[in-house]
């Protein structure tokens, strides 16, 4: 569970049922550290080093932490994946291909009690103004 008091409160409210029937969930993690196209590529930009998931592998655990702790397992997943910068400096005076996903939006369905509820997960490395921004919205 994230240490942040707000995250713990959101978890407790959702778990207790006090917010009523849940109608929608949106959870995400955004940052903007990769907006600079002159930033050298690192291991997170190469499928050979981090797998094909890219932003999903890097940021997904933060977006999924509370929903999974609440037992909300995504089904019927529709993904929108984006590669913002297909090439970056390699840090050695050259350029290298970046073949991982920079941004990922997952639209899913979850089971909350007897109801199916839409859940959107957002993992973005390229989000202007974001500085390691984690959030969750549980609408009920």
Located regions from the model:
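Predominantly a Rossmann-like dinucleotide-binding segment in NAD(P)-dependent oxidoreductases
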Residues: 2-98
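Contiguous beta-strand/loop segments that form the cofactor/metal-binding neighborhood of enzyme cores
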Residues: 64-140
